[in-house]
């Protein structure tokens, strides 16, 4: 089991390992693109969000920028979730929000 698999499983892993670098870079870069995309480019914002957090597809989540996370793929949304401005999700372990969960502004 590599460090990526260990991290996703919530097990002990080496955070400095080279095998995590590509995933971390992807998450940080995609988050940055999402945050810099203007509000009026809704389709682009949604595509970036779905790329970062696959469970955000089909109305799984609405997120107001700025939004920050480390990997994205470790975040799981139920239907109809909402995340307000300036939230930070440290998703080195799985984060799951059930259906209808709303997260207030400035939450970490």
Each predicted region: which residue ranges?
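Terminal amphipathic alpha-helical/low-complexity segments used for targeting or macromolecular assembly
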Residues: 1-60
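Left-handed beta-helix
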Residues: 59, 64-65, 70-79, 83-85, ...
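Glycine-rich, pocket-lining loop/helix-strand segments that form or immediately flank
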Residues: 108
């Amino acid at each position: 089991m590599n460090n990526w698999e260990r991290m996703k499983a919530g097990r002990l892993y080496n955070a400095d390992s080279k095998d995590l670098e590509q995933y971390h870079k992807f998450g940080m870069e995609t988050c940055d693109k999402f945050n810099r995309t203007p509000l009026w480019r809704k389709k682009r914002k949604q595509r970036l969000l779905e790329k970062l957090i696959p469970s955000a597809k089909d109305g799984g989540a609405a997120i107001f920028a700025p939004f920050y996370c480390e990997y994205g793929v470790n975040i799981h949304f139920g239907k109809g979730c909402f995340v307000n401005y300036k939230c930070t999700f440290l998703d080195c372990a799985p984060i799951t929000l059930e259906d209808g969960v709303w997260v207030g502004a400035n939450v970490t």
